[in-house]
């Protein structure tokens, strides 16, 4: 009879060599009839049961009975880890089921799995979405947070942000020249050597005798130019403060003020930055002004500013942007001479645009390499640190496991020695008792024989003989006990 396919006669029904849970005898389940009524094909079984790991936790009766115990925590008891030995699973195999061997000791592989679980828990932070920065969280306007330009220039107003160019356009795009009017004014190209001096227009005009006036720009483009100027000012201030901080960390000695005009100009702009933001930046120079007087006035202003600064601010600013912008300054001066000689109107970009674009280009090229190198080093270091920590944890766990094994072996050896000694003593006692019993049997047998022989004599002499025999028998037993080792114990 085929017990695997005849469900009517089989006490434990099977499906494809395994037990069919749908027809399993369930006396504790309240929905037993619903289970039997579920439609199932010849090879279809309920997906709630895992046949590769048969466990009584998958039985619905066990789930219903144990469910309220885990209900406050929302734990599914069918997903609990199988303990060693299992709690809710009997060690007896079912009908026609192979006996699975269980490993009681824990190995280093399982210890490494525990370490991997801890590592996955620690790596949850890397899987989470990035947290907003503190500036973005403090910004009450959500549109500025969503705008990518707001993350780069967080301190701009809403009307200025409309005209702010994108970061990839900042390094290459130069604003178009404004339409010229009838007045023939020449706007000198600003360099990193004189841009910081000409920020304070009245002071420079007084020293150089250069008339300062606002440029002739149409009223429609004034707001756009003002926003662009403010943006250039703030961007330049931020970049120079970062360069000044890096220079303070890297440069050890300080040189005299005569060799540090670049650093004095940059530090002067950082100090007087709050007085510059609301001033007009365009300056007009007439075509009759000599170029030699302009350069002399700029040098005098640089010397005055460098002499008025404290000694700490005269330290040289180690920044590649100023060194790389010297050829641009020479090109700008040659172009200015040509324009003066030919008496043509030249309208250049707002002040320090050349300096800003140069610095932004260099920063854009140099910074990502440093960031990539730093991040690669940090990632490699973090991985190596985690690997070393995991190996150290596994080594400690393995040493503790070996120590526990050694202690258990020593304890087992001590218990074995003690039990073996007790067994030897008990064996000796048993042997002594057996010898004593054999002697008593012999004496009792002899005494019974004497009693039977003298049983017919009822005289007084026979009674005395019996009493003497009994006393002699007791004395013999006492001597036997004394002679044996049991008397001492």
Swiss-Prot record:
Region (Basic motif): 386-406
InterPro entries for this protein: bZIP, bZIP_sf, bZIP_transcription_factors
Keywords: DNA-binding, Nucleus, Transcription, Transcription regulation
Subcellular location: Nucleus
Induction trigger: By nitrogen limitation.
Keyword Manganese found: no
A GO-annotated cellular component: nucleus
Highest taxon in the source lineage: Eukaryota
BP GO annotations: positive regulation of transcription by RNA polymerase II; regulation of transcription by RNA polymerase II
Positions of the bZIP domain: 384-447
Family of the protein in this entry: Belongs to the bZIP family.
PANTHER family reported for this sequence: CYCLIC-AMP RESPONSE ELEMENT BINDING PROTEIN (PTHR19304)
UniProt protein name: ATF/CREB activator 1
Organism: Saccharomyces cerevisiae (strain ATCC 204508 / S288c) (Baker's yeast)
Gene this protein is translated from: ACA1
């Amino acid at each position: 009879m085929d017990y695997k396919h005849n469900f009517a006669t089989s006490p434990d029904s099977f499906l494809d060599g395994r037990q069919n849970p749908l027809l399993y005898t369930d006396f504790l389940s309240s929905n037993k009839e619903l289970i039997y009524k579920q439609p199932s094909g010849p090879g279809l079984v309920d997906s709630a049961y895992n046949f590769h790991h048969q466990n009584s936790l998958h039985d619905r009766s066990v789930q219903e009975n144990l469910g309220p115990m885990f209900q406050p925590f929302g734990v599914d008891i069918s997903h609990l880890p199988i303990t060693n030995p299992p709690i809710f699973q009997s060690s007896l195999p079912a009908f026609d089921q192979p006996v699975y061997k269980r490993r009681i000791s824990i190995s280093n592989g399982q210890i490494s799995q525990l370490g991997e679980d801890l590592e996955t828990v620690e790596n949850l932070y890397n899987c989470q979405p990035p947290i907003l920065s503190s500036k973005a969280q403090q910004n009450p306007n959500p549109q500025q947070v969503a705008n990518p330009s707001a993350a780069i220039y967080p301190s701009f107003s809403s009307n200025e942000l409309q005209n702010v160019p994108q970061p990839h356009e900042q390094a290459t795009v130069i604003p178009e020249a404004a339409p010229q009017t009838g007045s023939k004014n020449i706007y000198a190209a600003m360099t990193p050597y004189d841009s910081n001096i000409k920020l304070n227009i009245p002071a420079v005009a007084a020293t150089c005798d250069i008339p300062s006036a606002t440029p002739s720009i149409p009223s429609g483009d004034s707001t756009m130019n003002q926003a662009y100027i403010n943006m250039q000012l703030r961007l330049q201030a931020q970049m120079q403060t970062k360069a000044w901080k890096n220079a303070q960390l890297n440069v050890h000695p300080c040189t005299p003020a005569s060799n540090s005009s670049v650093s004095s100009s940059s530090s002067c702009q950082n100090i007087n930055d709050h007085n510059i933001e609301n001033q007009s930046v365009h300056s007009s120079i007439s075509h009759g002004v000599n170029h030699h007087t302009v350069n002399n006035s700029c040098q005098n202003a640089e010397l005055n500013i460098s002499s008025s600064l404290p000694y700490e601010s005269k330290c040289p600013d180690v920044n590649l942007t100023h060194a790389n912008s010297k050829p641009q300054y020479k090109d700008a001066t040659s172009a200015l001479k040509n324009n003066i000689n030919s008496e043509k109107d030249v309208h250049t970009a707002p002040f320090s645009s050349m300096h800003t674009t140069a610095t932004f280009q260099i920063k854009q090229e140099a910074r990502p390499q440093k960031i990539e190198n730093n991040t690669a080093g940090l990632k490699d270091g973090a991985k190596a640190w985690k690997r070393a920590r995991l190996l150290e944890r596994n080594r400690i766990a393995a040493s503790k496991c070996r120590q526990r094994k050694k202690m258990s072996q020593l304890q087992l050896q001590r218990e074995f020695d003690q039990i073996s000694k007790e067994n030897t003593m008990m064996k000796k006692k048993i042997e002594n008792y057996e010898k004593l019993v054999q002697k008593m049997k012999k004496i009792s047998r002899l005494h019974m024989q004497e009693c039977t022989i003298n049983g017919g004599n009822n005289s007084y002499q026979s009674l005395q003989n019996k009493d003497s025999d009994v006393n002699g028998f007791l004395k013999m037993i006492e001597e036997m006990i004394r002679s044996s080792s049991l008397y001492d114990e």
